[in-house]
Amino acid sequence: MQKNQKNCCGVWMDGHKAMIVKLGEGATNIGIIDSDMDEAYYHDGEKIIGSFSGRQHESPEKTISERKHNIEKKYMKQIFEEIKNNDEIYIIGPGEMRHRFEHFIEAEHKRDAHKIKANDSCDYLREVHIVDRIKKYFKIS
């Protein structure tokens, strides 16, 4: 990488984990962030009776949906904190989470939305292949 090149990073993500690949001067740093998405589902007994809150009875679907939304937002905040200082961001992944992450950045961090250079579909890959794909995108050998 030349000295005048920008700091680039790629994010491979799905609903369970994100792999962040930061490309700096002559170095590649890889980090993993796990989501807590599995915790978003039913607690014991909740699928039968729902949750009670004072005089209200909330359906378990509403409670689970809110819990899932909050966990997803926390997950996206963690990822963004790791990549916010990069000049260019490349997002890849197999499902809809990558689109929701891009929308999260556009809504919550408008000043940084221009850093997203691409958002591409990508199957589940081994770590080495994810790194290779991100390097290839940024034309780094």
Feature names for model-found ranges:
Residues 1-141:
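Terminal alpha-helical anchor/extension segments at protein ends
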